Structure formats: C-alpha cells, structure tokens
Swiss-Prot record:
<protein>
    <recommendedName>
        <fullName>Putative MSV199 domain-containing protein 200R</fullName>
    </recommendedName>
</protein>
Length: 61
C-alpha cells in the first residue's frame, strides 16, 4: 500500500522541521505538481508554491 509523506509521518512518532532545506526541496516539486492538476489555470497567478508553514497544517506531538 502506498502512502503519502504526511500520512506516513503522522503514523510515526517523528516530526519534520518544515523550515528545513530538505523539506522545502521536497515540497516545491510536490506543490508544483498539485497546482498543475487544477481545473483552472490563472495566467496572472504567481507560480511560486505557498510557503510550507501555510500550506501544511500538520501538528505532531
């Protein structure tokens, strides 16, 4: 069974620093792929991904 990264992390007792370079390098291609699959493509929209702090609301304890 294949899981996405966030589901995998939530099932484990680990955390990821969303400000780390590793996470930003991982997040950018994923967010870019998700945005290309939208129904509407606004030409005036900025193509940069949202910052991970705003896009990911995963709270790990």
């Amino acid at each position: 069974m294949m899981k996405d990264l966030f589901t995998f992390v939530m099932d484990k007792n680990i955390s990821i620093d969303i400000n780390s370079d590793w996470f930003k390098e991982l997040w950018y291609p994923l967010s870019k792929k998700c945005r290309s699959n939208t129904l509407f493509d606004f030409k005036d929209e900025v193509k940069a991904p949202p910052p991970p702090e705003r896009a990911v609301k995963v709270w790990l304890y």
